[in-house]
Structure formats: structure tokens, C-alpha cells
């Protein structure tokens, strides 16, 4: 397994520590989620000096979410950052938008947005991806919802996040439906509840979820991994996980977790 540091899992730490932790724990690369207050060129230099490949950039600007008229121009700045980082993949997650009228209408809006920005990414030599998102009002979660968009936007691909998919449907079935579009992976773990509880958030299935460290929740990630095709096992896997109780340092946690996951 190509284990990847997801930089937002160490949000608030200096970028030097994020990079050094990834290297010391044997990770195979990093996905810069936003720029952590630095320029893309600065992040690229830190990674180059440390010998840490940049496998992706996740764009976090929110103009499209807030219906800003300059959303496409804002995307171009995220694309420029991806090019500077030499990130082969740029992921723009379809989070719920302000003023959502319906899930179907929002999927249509996202389809139009991705159709406009995907050719820009292709021209820059960057693969643009979407992911399922796991909020109670997320409009793109299940496989058929993803396919509704993907089939209308040539060149758009999927960052497959089984945890987010599981907020609505069986992630293995979704994997089978989406596998021709998958170019990147995110792994996370959840605790599930059928009733509201402190720290749990509502999701589309009607259940409630809470973040937990990979291996301590209810997501069958190891089993899913065992059933994935070899071509997908060769893809980068963001470790979208940390000690959510704050009891262990990232270095301590990842030193133990990374070797375990590489054995899957």
C-alpha cells in the first residue's frame, strides 16, 4: 500500500514537521490539502529537499460553495498551485453549497461546474477528481450519483473514499460500479450510531457518524482492500486519520499505523 500523508490531518503543525513526520514514518508521499499559509513553491521545495513525492493537491477555496461569480477564476488559482506542486491529481470535493434547493439540482450545478473546469485541468496536464462527500446534505455520495456527473464530464475521475460512500451505501458495491474512474484513494474510519449522540454527525443514510482512528471503528477497510483490483492497490492512499482524542502525537500514531497498513 502506498500510504500518503493527508496534510490536513496535521493542521496547525509547521509544514516542516508535517513533512518530516511523513518521511520518518515511511509514508510514500503527501497530499497538500490547501497550502497551510505558504506558497505552492515553498511546499514543493520542502518536499523536494526531503525526498517526499507530492501525490495530489486538494483545493479548499470555497467560492463555488458560496456561489461567488469568480468561482472559475478561483479554480484557476488552485490549478496553478497544483501545477507548481507538480501534483498529478487535483481534487475538488463537491461539498454542499449555500442555498441548496435540492440534491438533484445541486448535482446539476456541480456537473456544469466540473464540465467547465475539467478541460482546464486537462490542458495543464493535471487529472481532476471528485469524491463522495459524507455530509447530511451532500448531493454526490452514492455510486449512481457520482456516475450521473462523470458520464457527462469526459476526463473527470474519482478519488474513492469508502468511508464517505458508507454514509449512504455499501462501499464495495460502489467500488465495483466506479472502478473504471478511480485514480486515487482516501481511507478513514467511522463509528456509527442509529440515534443522535454527542460528537456524531447526521449523514444521508439516516445514521450518525463520528471520526475515529483507522482500525478502531466500524469500516471494513482491510476487507475492502483485499477485494480491490491490483491496479487500484497500486494507487496512492491518503490516510485520512489521526488521534481524534489528542492522546498521541502524529509521529507516535503514524509510526505504528503505517507499517500495519502496508501489510494489508
Language-model regions: role of each:
Residues 28-29, 53, 88, 127, ...:
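Residue-level detector of anion-binding/catalytic polar loops
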Residues 44-62, 111-121, 147-153, 219-222, ...:
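Alpha-helix-loop-beta-strand connector modules within alpha/beta enzyme cores
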Residues 6-10, 33-35, 59-63, 95-97, ...:
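Active-site beta-loop-alpha junctions enriched in small/polar residues
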Residues 31-48, 97-102:
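Glycine-rich, proline-tolerant flexible connector loops at the mouths of alpha/beta enzymes
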Residues 31, 56, 91, 129, ...:
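Conserved beta-strand positions in the central sheet of alpha/beta enzyme cores
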